[in-house]
Regions:
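Extended, low-hydrophobicity, polar/charged segments
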Residues: 1-184
């Protein structure tokens, strides 16, 4: 798969979804510089590996989680190579019985479909229904990769821009968590 890294938004946004264009508008309004890769839908690990290599940054695994009653929701950003075990996270955030949230909540709260979950979706969560959780290892990388609310493009953002500009503008104060690394 041959991928070409481009700086900023596409020159021609025709044929792109409104939620993708909103992502570029939001980043541009914050003065955040970014690089973009357009690609086929990132649904397999092979595609994700090629994207990771081309972006040259950490692609986050983003999970939408909820408690058993579906009254508390969490978006977890973690390195793609880490294994997620609910027990490792539950105690840190004081929520038992975490599970993966139904895709309908992604669409309802974030205007994102499964496979496209991204920190940029939080710009659509005006009621702050989702608590942002970030594994500490994500913050060790100089760059963070994410989707512009659609999984046919990936962005590389400077970690400092994410921490100092993007997260404050999203109005979602993150909780930093420590997820263990398991041996394969």
């Amino acid at each position: 798969m041959q991928l070409q890294l481009q700086h900023g938004r596409p020159a021609d946004c025709s044929g792109r979804l409104e939620k993708e264009i909103r992502s570029y508008d939001f980043l541009d309004s914050l003065g955040i510089s970014y690089y973009r890769l357009d690609h086929e839908p990132a649904m397999t690990m092979e595609i994700c590996a090629a994207i990771d290599e081309s972006l040259g940054g950490l692609i986050c695994k983003n999970l939408l989680l909820c408690n058993r009653q579906c009254t508390s929701f969490y978006m977890l950003m973690m390195p793609g190579d880490k294994v997620f075990k609910t027990k490792d996270l539950s105690a840190q955030i004081g929520s038992s019985r975490l599970s993966f949230a139904d895709g309908k909540y992604m669409e309802e709260f974030l205007d994102i479909t499964p496979g496209s979950l991204s920190i940029l979706g939080l710009m659509n969560d005006k009621e702050n229904r989702i608590q942002l959780l970030i594994d500490e290892d994500v913050l060790k990388s100089p760059f963070i990769g994410c989707h512009p609310c659609i999984n046919t493009s990936s962005l590389r953002l400077d970690k400092e821009d994410v921490v100092q500009k993007l997260i404050p503008a999203l109005n979602h104060e993150p909780i930093i968590v420590q997820l263990p690394t398991y041996e394969a």
